[in-house]
Amino acid sequence: MAKIYYVGDWAAMLGPVFAETPFNYTVKGTEIFNYGKWLKDAIESSGRHEVTSVPTWDFYRLPPGGLEEVLEAYDVVVFSDVESKNFQLAPAFFDRTKFGRQPLTFPDRVRLCVEAVHRGTHLMFMGGWLSFNGELGKGGWGRTQLKEILPVECLQFEDLRESTEGFAGQATRPDHPLFRGIDLTTLPPILGYNVVRPREGCDVLATWTGTADPMFATGQFGRGRVLAYTSDPAPHWGCNFVFWDHYARLWVNAVDWLVGG
């Protein structure tokens, strides 16, 4: 059984906000959404794998040594809509009570992930507004050392391509184990994706129809395998995708391939 640590695809809705007077307002209600439940359920559907799904803010608040423990304990780590600031900043940097007492530093999460992949941890990078380079460049993956273990090259500017009519995909490597039992021609409309470029030495398994833009790409870095999917495995881009008949099988295939050696 593979153990998967899945970061991202959670959201909190705060409000609505009621302004009762010019000097008083109240936030009424808090609702937490786990948009990652579809991917978690899909991967676990075979009964062979176990997924721990955590919000991005839990990843951000891991204490020193916390990510090291995760990378040691889990076979696969998934990042979906996790902008680079969550790797590069730490809560202590904004705690004024700690200022001036001693130099504030934190273990480099990017470096830890890169080193873990070379030792044999496997990664999945998923698309979204805060993935790859992302909306207004907020994703920022390509501006970090993560680019060393990405099987695609990020653009240097906003990379979102969206359509209310959606996009289709086509397999360029239909014989790859990812597509075992999968017919990509039945894929429902995908409402957006991150535009990236193929990376030399890595494999593009599928492209977005009518383009050369990678949809699925893979790479081997040291002992670890990495899979990139350039759209979102969850709503909103994936609001049709999660109800596709082949959705669960696709992600089971993905994990099986990653850990298959």
Describe the residue ranges of each PLM region.
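An acidic, glycine-rich "communication" segment
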Residues: 1-2, 9-19, 118, 122-210
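Extracytoplasmic/secreted proteins, especially bacterial periplasmic and envelope-associated proteins
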Residues: 34, 38, 108, 112, ...
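Active-site-proximal beta-strand/loop segments in catalytic clefts of secreted hydrolases
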Residues: 7-10, 56, 79-83, 126-129, ...
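Hydrophobic targeting/anchoring helices
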Residues: 1-32, 64, 207, 230-231, ...
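Helical hinge/lid and interdomain linker segments adjacent to catalytic or ligand-binding clefts
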Residues: 22-137
